[in-house]
Amino acid sequence: MSGIESTEEPCDSMTESQSLSPLEPEERQTRKDSGLQSQSLTKRHFAFSPHRLITSISRHTSPHKPRPKSESRVPVPKLHSLPPQRLASPERDKPSIEGISKSFVSFLTAASVYAGFQDLEGEDQQVSPDDVSAGESEDQQADESSDEQEDDDQDDRTFYATDPSPTELTINENTPLPEPEPPRRTLRKARSRFEFSVVKRLSENENDQLAQKRAIALSNKLKRTFDISDTDVFISDYPCWLMGDVLLQGHLYITKHHILFFAFLPKKQGSISKSGALTTKSYPSLREHRKWAVLRNNTFSVYSNSTDLYFPLLVIDLRTALRAEILQSSSTKQNPSKPVWIRIITESRTHWFLADNLASARSWVSSLKKHIFASRNKGDQVAIKIPLQNVVDLELTSVIGVTKNLRIKVIESADTFAIDDYFLMFFSRGEKAVEDIKKVIHDAGMEISEGTSTESEDEQGVDNNLLKSKIELLKKSPSMVQTSSKSNVPVIRMDEPADDFSQEQESAESSKPVSDDEIVSADDNQELEEKQPQDNLANAEKENHDKVSRANSRRTWSTRSLVQGLTAITQGWMSPSPMAHFDEKYAVLRGEEDSYFVKDAEQRKAATERFRKHFSLTDGEKLIATYHAYLVKGIPAYGKIYLGSNEMCFRSTLPGTGTIMILPFSDIENVNKEKGFRFGYSGLVVVIHGHEELFFEFASDQARDDCEFMLLKQMDMFKKGSTDSSPPNASEGSSDESCNLAESNTSLASARLRMFENRIHDAIGLDVPIIIEEHPLTKTKVRPLKSYRFTLLTIGSRGDVQPYIALGKALMKEGHQVRIVTHAEFEPWIKKHGIRFASIAGDPSELMALMVTHPTINYNFIKEAKSKFRSWIDDLLVTSWKACQDTDILIESPSSICGIHIAEKLQIPYFRAFTMPWTRTRAYPHAFMVPDQKLGGAYNYMTHVAFENGYWRGTAHQVNKWRVETLGLPKTSLAEMKQNNVPFLYNVSPTVFPPSVDFAEWVKVTGYWFLDESETYQPPEVLTKFIEQARKDGKKVVYIGFGSIVVSKPSELTQAVVDAVLEADVRCILNKGWSDRLGTKTEIEVVLPPEIYNAGSVPHDWLFPQIDAAVHHGGSGTTGASLRFGVPTIIKPFFGDQKFYAGRVEDLGCGVSLKDLNYKSLARALKEVTTNTRIIEKAKLVGARIRSETGVQTAIETIYNEMEYARSLSISKVKQVSVVKSDEEFDDDKDEEVEGSWLLV
């Protein structure tokens, strides 16, 4: 079946069939001669058929055996990973699609499954067979009590279910409904026969106005979507799933003349579905390069880093993609951290990317498959229309329980006579659906063949006779199957599946001629377009890659492309019209004839199509104007500026260059005219939010001025449209966070679904992405069914504990059990939030005092730490092991030392989470080894390696002794721990800490985990009056507090603060925190003036929105809180990560870093941050970005996505217990050799 490419499978006796005409009558096309069609379209069809899925499994599980031409059935692969009882027919050694679906559905419906959709199997009990809904049901808001109910008999491995809201529902009175089409004014139009049949079927009571209104809305929707005749009759509808490369939730509608399938696809306009680092190889050097990949609606873009997202190195239009797939060797599963190649095959070429591991590769490919599928269907919906007279065979097979698999074999059209297969999965009432279809076929006087699992020669003859009769019928009354697919795929009949990649790729390369408008690839771009693994691919693949690379190389550097580039330059220099207008409304605004307006409608249409093609834009994007100019970014790049309805784009036209810019209007702040860098040129500066300005040079003032006018006019229209569509009374902060919270909830649901897909893949070896229908009136909610027991382990200060409380509360909302393990003094605070608590050894104030005394890691620090904290480390290891019992998932701050060993013993998923740079990277130095000036990537990477070795050597003796005596594990080493392979969560904003391209896929910068406590906080009346009086006096209000820092002379620090506040003429809210914690004084030793109010501890989310600046020590949590609310920040770092964040605040331009703290430096900094408008505006911009992030939801999403990978790491480690009780084995003076590590002295 070719109508929806990713949900089709060819018939048994015939091969690939033609894609069906779209539903719009004007777009219908009849293909008379299938043999003359393009082979690239053939491959596009094959790329999305379930037959390719089956044959690909066959290639990986058993040797390929050609099928004899006389055999009528498609060869079905043997799934060695499935137990015999999971197959549809145990006696057959080749499972059919039913066998695969049986294994798949077992995870959805059985009581002893890993995961499933709980409500689906129970639909028969909730809805009678005669009760038929139209698929447009109420928006379910499940009762909280029902969310907490679980089946006591269910196996504890079950961890997924949808909310208990069946697919077949009724609409309540509050549910919005599409309005029916209004009647004609001239004559009251009676209901058509089709409308009457829908109303009669769906409303038992004639007086039920709501049901009738719903029925009319459904009939109008079906008529508009499927072009249903008024004389047709509605029979019934059923919820079902369409099977193919994806499993799509939707509805089956049966009428007197047609079988209809319809589903709403998820809508994510402009949002990023997935992003991360991937490795590419350049040609011909085969050097590896790390790039940043971003997956959006219809595009897969590659950038040089995660911050410069306006200049893609490569943009793949997924509307031209055939498929995405993984290439893995037999050793991949044995080593979960081994890199794996993936490839995206398009109509013109193949793109190779190296993922960090198999889990990452599967995540990328699954997301790509969903996007490719969605991009090939019109209007965010999937629609299939099958005339009943085209149906040849119905085959219903049982899967598990009431779950049925329906195979519909149809003749595509009277022109091609190709046979397509549609596979539908019913979780209830599958027999009733088949009965309805058979009844309407029988009533129409037609006949079909009832397929079985095996066929004899006589039965095959009957099928042939039936096929001939069907063809004769179609010749007399032509009809064709129609789908919402954007492309028409020809029918090519083959005896063997077209799965030879070499033949496919050669055809793809030769099928598309070089276009005059094709973007010429730069060196960096070219290296991305053809990737070839060296070790794990077959020789045939390598040879094919060489052919493709040579073909692309010839294309890129051909004489034709060179001449085209030179011609473009010459025309740009010499053309009397260096600009062109394409929108009629601007010509009217000028009040006179626009000499630059392109009057030919066909030329305007062709230019718009080229514009969309160049930048892979949506079909709704309009071209407004174009200009020839230079982009001055390093070396000036000559090219063309395109102004669209939503973006400003640039494309270089020089031969050998491939600079592309896609800049949304929403990110442009202003446009200014300037003088050009070169004599005779005019400049235009585009000011971008949070990004360096872009400078363009034009050959004339006229072109520059026209570009400025058009750009400002289009920006005003864009912003006006955005303002009109936004809520009128929403505050800036609340609207930012609420909108992004809704988006994060969608991402979280996708992560739950991905976690479900991972468990299915690990059990049955299939990787079929699942798409949940985004119905406008009802929503299928995927929620965790199993309650996992999370343990969050950390040591340190209040700032180290607070993020875990925020994460713990969110995990509890997901239905999990959470326990925080940390120092005893935080127990009341943690329990106040309803989180379980367990204590470990250690006094955090002593740790703070040691760190303040030794701001950097040096010999004296190691010596003092070893003498003071040796016994504490022993106690920490023992108490942590006891506290982490009965744990399913462990999340630990890596400074706690012991978590990775506990996870190895318990064989559970293990994650690390921290607030400062801790993983190896060239982008940032280690937080404890930050230099006074930037020393480059080599130094940064060295600091991480040196710290890892030093930190391990300082604790290795005690850790290994504890492993052997307490855990029963053998000794380990830095290399054997493989801590750089552990999934890592940075609870820091990507705005403050942009993820580096050399971060592994399992290293995620999630965003801050904020704990909002302002709702329960009652501020003292004195504090509120202090703030009000400062506002009346026209004075700036600043916050000064140093949190958990312990200082030896607190009175001197207080006096410096007092003098600085008076000097700067501001009002101060003071919070000394732990600054005098180790002292004996209980009251402030310095008398505070009226300009300073000693507030003590105040929730940041209550205080910071009301102040003008903040002064603090630069801890991650406090820095995030001040930046979150757009407050200019002054940081005086004392130790550790504080120096790192002080530098980041200065780099962002939203604050000041103090090297020395005295009243003069502090006063000067206070004046700077309260009066410098640049710092104030920059802080507001950074705050808006941080408020748009949802760190906690992103963290949970990452946990779900990486859970199976984290589990595989723990399981893959050594399990053999080596018990050594002799104390001689642990000699303190013995220098232990650590394999694979080194220490820089």
UniProtKB/Swiss-Prot annotation:
Any single Pfam family the record assigns to this protein: EryCIII-like_C
Matches recorded under InterPro entries: ATG26_PH_GRAM1 (IPR048066), ATG26_PH_GRAM2 (IPR048065), EryCIII-like_C (IPR010610), Glycosyltransferase_28 (IPR050426), GlycoTrans_28_N (IPR004276), GRAM (IPR004182), PH-like_dom_sf (IPR011993), PH_domain (IPR001849)
E.C. number(s) listed in UniProt: 2.4.1.-, 2.4.1.173
GO biological process: autophagy; carbohydrate metabolic process; lipid glycosylation; protein transport; sterol biosynthetic process
Mode of membrane association: Peripheral membrane protein
Coiled-coil residue spans: none
Biased composition annotated in UniProt, kind: Polar residues: 723-741
Keyword Transport: yes
UniProt KW Transferase keyword: yes
Domain PH: 271-373
Biased composition (Basic and acidic residues): 25-34, 540-549
PANTHER family per record: STEROL 3-BETA-GLUCOSYLTRANSFERASE
Family listed: Belongs to the glycosyltransferase 28 family.
UniProt protein name: Sterol 3-beta-glucosyltransferase
